[in-house]
Regions:
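Conserved acidic carboxylate
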Residues: 9, 56
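Two-component/phosphorelay signaling modules centered on CheY-like receiver
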Residues: 12-30
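Acidic, metal-coordinating helix/loop segments flanking the phosphotransfer/catalytic sites
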Residues: 31-49
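Acidic catalytic/metal-coordinating carboxylates
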Residues: 34, 60-63
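Active-site residues of response regulator receiver
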Residues: 53, 82
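The feature encodes the CheY-like receiver
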Residues: 57, 86, 105
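Short amphipathic alpha-helix used as the core "switch/output" element in two-component signaling
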Residues: 62-75
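C-terminal output helix
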Residues: 106-115
């Protein structure tokens, strides 16, 4: 069975591009554009990896991870994406349980390599 990725990203363009890329790479994909939707999907579906934008319209992507961890539904791995490079933010992501933090724009080849590493 294919690993499942939950894309949590408020940009429809980015979400659609990632979804197409991941489906072509053989992954099952779910997507959400808000904290509320991502939390609901994460609680309802088995997710292996969450690709998590930190800035969402209704809060922080880290809120999603916290809610899923609290519900016992955290994915095997969470990969945070952000346009910010502050060391404090990176540490906050790691403290919340993220496996890694990638700075946007994320090179596709690097993203796929990191996903394969985290799911391997």
């Amino acid at each position: 069975m294919a690993a499942t990725i939950l894309i949590v990203e408020d940009s429809a363009l980015v979400t659609d591009a990632f979804a197409l890329l991941f489906i072509e790479a053989g992954y099952a994909v779910h997507s959400a554009r808000t904290v509320a939707d991502a939390t609901r999907i994460g609680k309802e579906k088995a997710v292996d990896l969450m690709l998590l934008d930190l800035t969402l319209p209704d809060g922080s992507g880290l809120d999603v991870l916290g809610a899923l961890r609290e519900a016992g539904r955290a994915p095997r791995a969470t990969l945070a994406m952000t346009g910010h490079t502050e060391p404090e933010l990176r540490q906050k992501c790691f403290d919340a349980g993220c496996a890694d933090v990638m700075v946007k724009p994320v090179p596709i080849r690097d993203l796929l390599r990191q996903i394969e590493r985290l799911l391997g």
